[in-house]
Every structure is written in C-alpha cells, then in structure tokens.
Amino acid sequence: MVLVQESLILGIETSCDETAAAIVRNGKEILSNIVNSQIDIHQQFGGVVPEVASRKHIENIAGVVHRAFSEAQLAYSAIDAVAVTNRPGLVGALLVGVSFAKAFAYALEKPLIAVNHLHGHIYANFLEHRDIEFPAICLVVSGGHTSLLLMSNPNKMEVLGETRDDAAGEAFDKVARFLGLGYPGGPAIQEAATKGKAGQLQLPRVFLDRNDFEFSFSGLKTAAMNQWNKLQRRGQANVFDMAAEFQAALVEVLVEKSIKAAAKYQVRTIMMAGGVAANQELRNLMKKRTKEAGLKLFYPSLKLCTDNAAMVAANAHYHYGNRSFAPLSLNAYPSLLSL
C-alpha cells in the first residue's frame, strides 16, 4: 500500500439532519468546516423527520459548500477530490449529498470518494491527535449505531461487537422523550443527570456479564420506562435521579466492554467516536478506567463528535492515497452493509 501524503479534499455530509461541507488538507488540517444544523426544526417533532430533513438539505447544500470554499479561501478547482457520506443514514438525506457530490466531481473532473459515516466518526480523531498508536480499540457510539472495533492500522478494522437492537444514542432519545426532557435526548439527559444521583434507582447493566462484545439497550430502555411508570403511580417519580441512573447504566456498559476488549486483544489504545462520545459522564468514566488500566485514550473535541464533513474528508484522505475512488453511478444506502 502506498499512501499519498498530500491531498486537499472537499467532504460532504448529509446522512441525517446536518448539512455539512469541509475542506481538509492531508487528512489532518481543517481549512473550513461548515455545519448547518436542523435541530431547531426537528425539536418540535421530538425527533428527526426524514422528509423534512431531505428538503432542508436540498435548500442548504449549495450554500454550505460555497461557504466551505469561501472560508478556506480556495477556488473550486483547487481540490484534489470530492468525498461524500453514502451510508448509512436516512436514504433521502444521503441522496442529496451524494447527488450533489457526483455532479460537483463531474463538473470539476475530480475523483469521487464514498465514505462510510461511521468510519468518518472514527477518523475525526486523526484531525486532532497525531500520536495515536495502533492497534487500537475503537468505541463508536451514535444515534443510530453502537459498535466496538479493533483497528490494526488506519486502513484496517474488524468489528468485535455491535448493538443487537437500540443504539446508545437512540436509547437516550427514547428515554428522554418519555421523561419529558425533549430532543435531542443525549444532552437533555446529561443535563438532568447533573441534578440527580445515580444509585437511587436500580437499572440493569445489560450484557455486562457476558464474555462477548455485543450490546443491547432496548432492555435498559424498557426497564427505565417500567420503573418510571411505577414511580409515577406512587407519586415518587424523580426525573433527575432517573436520568442519572439511566446514564450511569448505559455508560458503564460502554466503558467496561471497551476495557475488556483492550485486555483480550492486548491493546494499549482506546478511541471513542460518534455523537454519544460527547457525553461527559462517558468521557469521565472512560478516563478513569483507562488510567487505572494504563491505557491511552483518545476522543475528538465536542464539535467533531457530532456530524460534520471534516471527518468525511479526513477518512477520504486514506481512500485517496489508495486510489479507492467511486464511480459516478454511486448510490446511497440506508444500512451499514459492511463496516
């Protein structure tokens, strides 16, 4: 494998409700990173409405890309390639980014690069950390996915385990909804948890006693819902304690599974990625446990944990080095296909 060290790549991200474009040099230096969020629009619905998200992407994509070039002070022709998230995500939303990227690449006669959204989250770490040692365990936690991977090097990864039902971020959203905390659920539960105390209630640590690296958060969500309904009937419901206990139960499983994976595969590095990696309780407990185990820990800054296009361009740098280009017939896929 020959890795080209020099690249200037436009990244485009429209997998959910952020319209994003960024220009990154050599997979590490962010020249621009524009994100147009739709959170305010979808809050009134209690979650992302796919049709609305797609229409807003159509309205925003051209302007967001133009702003990325303007902020980077570059002409369109200066880039070496166009990269776009084409899986997984909301298919209508993905199609907006993919269609724009294909047309843009064709017009500029530049190569097109397809990026897996979850790979993008992982490579957000490379934008801010230069000393990541491999092999590494990577915990990817987002609204739609929860996976534990073994990365042998920046170009090779193996899935060790995934969620069998709800993703961590999805569980946060659903629990926040029935607690009346609003959307998005992760930040809402994190805020409520600061006013409560974990341990006042007892929620299960699902799959924690298993020797594999699978996850399941549907049972935790259901247990929280059942306890909440009982407490409400008794007039003993405390939303802050419930938020704290739910967050603690979910975070403990994520952290301990990661530590066990590092021990089994004799790895000295753990990376975290994805929107849920912004959770402060997760960061704090992972810091504590990796320090106790003598492991190195890496995670992106808060602005790079959530969906953005800089991470897409960062991942695309490695595809560019391998000359792994996509045809102009590239399609969008809602499912992961293969990680």
UniProtKB/Swiss-Prot annotation:
GO terms for cellular component: cytoplasm. Keywords: Acyltransferase, Cytoplasm, Iron, Metal-binding, Transferase, tRNA processing. It comes from the Bacteria. Binds 1 Fe(2+) ion per subunit. Its EC number is 2.3.1.234. One of its GO terms (biological process) is tRNA threonylcarbamoyladenosine modification. Its main location: cytoplasm. Fe cation binds at residues 117, 121, 307. One of its GO terms (molecular function) is N(6)-L-threonylcarbamoyladenine synthase activity. Pfam families: TsaD. Its cofactor is Fe(2+). It catalyses: L-threonylcarbamoyladenylate + adenosine(37) in tRNA = N(6)-L-threonylcarbamoyladenosine(37) in tRNA + AMP + H(+). NCBIfam families: gcp_kae1, T6A_TsaD_YgjD. Belongs to the KAE1 / TsaD family. Required for the formation of a threonylcarbamoyl group on adenosine at position 37 (t(6)A37) in tRNAs that read codons beginning with adenine. Is involved in the transfer of the threonylcarbamoyl moiety of threonylcarbamoyl-AMP (TC-AMP) to the N6 group of A37, together with TsaE and TsaB. TsaD likely plays a direct catalytic role in this reaction. PANTHER family: TRNA N6-ADENOSINE THREONYLCARBAMOYLTRANSFERASE, TRNA N6-ADENOSINE THREONYLCARBAMOYLTRANSFERASE, MITOCHONDRIAL. This is tRNA N6-adenosine threonylcarbamoyltransferase. It comes from Syntrophomonas wolfei subsp. wolfei (strain DSM 2245B / Goettingen). The lineage of its organism: Bacteria, Bacillati, Bacillota, Clostridia, Eubacteriales.
